[in-house]
A protein has these predicted regions:
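Long, low-complexity, charge-biased intrinsically disordered regions
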Residues: 1-187
């Protein structure tokens, strides 16, 4: 996955630690279907200006949702909800972040993990995910609304598509079946 590379720690490096989090996944009937493990960075140990700069990640405001829902009803738009799996892991890490080797992976050396990709728990994970999503939507000809930084619109001839974003949950509103199918394939 190339999430990190092992390196000798640079002098005066501040290391963050990590923790394994174990999750049970259940089906609709309450039957255990799988076990899941996630490595989480302890981002509370990060220092501003040292291993992160920006942490702000916008969310859609309720007034924008209400306005889009009113448009949807008036114009008979279709609606679909989408959840982006592993969204925070998709951001691009810009800062140098060093982390102790995870429990169970320690190779007995003094080497540390220089993170290449995001991990859950990093202070900048949400912000970087939002930057990546914004860039992707703009590449698909969506325009970000000035009045709502988590609302995007695209007009395609007679069709209109609106996407609203709440962290890693998207609501897709479209005026036609073909546009809905086209947007489903873009994720």
């Amino acid at each position: 996955m190339e999430t990190w590379k092992l390196v000798n720690p640079p002098p005066n490096t501040i290391l963050i630690t990590n923790k394994w989090v174990y999750i049970n996944k259940w089906d609709k009937l309450g039957k255990l279907i799988k076990y899941k493990a996630q490595l989480v960075a302890k981002g509370f140990a990060q220092y501003p200006g040292y291993d992160y700069v920006e942490t702000f990640s916008p969310v859609i405001c309720m007034e924008t949702i209400c306005a889009v829902l009113a448009l949807m009803v008036k114009n008979r738009y279709q609606i679909q909800q989408m959840d982006i799996k592993g969204a925070y892991l998709n951001g691009i890490l810009k800062e140098k972040v060093y982390m102790k080797q995870p429990e169970g992976y320690n190779d007995g050396t003094r080497w540390v993990c220089e993170l290449i990709k995001m991990l859950y728990g990093l202070k900048q994970s949400g912000c970087e995910w939002n930057h990546k999503l914004d860039s992707k939507l703009k590449n698909f000809s969506y325009t970000r609304l000035y009045s709502g930084p988590c609302a995007y619109i695209q007009c395609d001839r007679d069709n209109t598509s609106i996407i609203t974003v709440w962290v890693d949950d998207l609501l897709l509103f479209t005026s036609g079946d073909d546009l809905m199918q086209k947007n489903e394939g873009k994720n």
